[in-house]
From Swiss-Prot:
Organism whose genome encodes this protein: Bacillus subtilis (strain 168)
Keyword Cell membrane: yes
Protein keywords: Cell membrane, Electron transport, Heme, Iron, Membrane, Metal-binding, Transmembrane, Transmembrane helix, Transport, Tricarboxylic acid cycle
Record-given protein name: Succinate dehydrogenase cytochrome b558 subunit
GO cellular component assignments: plasma membrane
GO biological process: tricarboxylic acid cycle
Gene this protein is translated from: sdhC
Amino acid sequence: MSGNREFYFRRLHSLLGVIPVGIFLIQHLVVNQFAARGAEAFNSAAHFMDSLPFRYALEIFIIFLPLIYHAVYGVYIAFTAKNNAGQYSYMRNWLFVLQRVTGIITLIFVSWHVWETRIAAQMGAEVNFDMMANILSSPAMLGFYIVGVLSTIFHFSNGLWSFAVTWGITVTPRSQRISTYVTLIIFVALSYVGLKAIFAFV
């Protein structure tokens, strides 16, 4: 019985990491990309997102609750999984370890980012271009955001590989090998988008 629960918990964890959390990540990166066009373009994009109907319901049920489940169960997996990269020097095993490490970094980064933006907004702060520019004016915070964004993107991109295996999309060694390179390409592409947005605020 406990084995069945574990199976379904892991399936749900895998699903929520892509739908809706992963989709939200991509949407967030796209909105932040408007910063490269200037403060006015970014503020307009941010205002559009803030003006969505049922925004709070969407944030709670489509973003925060799935994210909390994925994060909590992900921490459990990170501290109970047996890492074998030291024993087997294969790229997939190292990616397995990095998935767990970046998951913890992502949790810290996202928690801090939510505090600095969403919680601050509820306390009266205006989330706009100037807010992010002020945050990233600190070299320490700039470094923190670079590491955080890259970790988040890697965790999502590499997680797509696990998602494909978990849901029976890639079942053969060849398809899984191809999937590894595809997800690494996705990581590089999204990293470019994320870093471009960060440096647009600097």
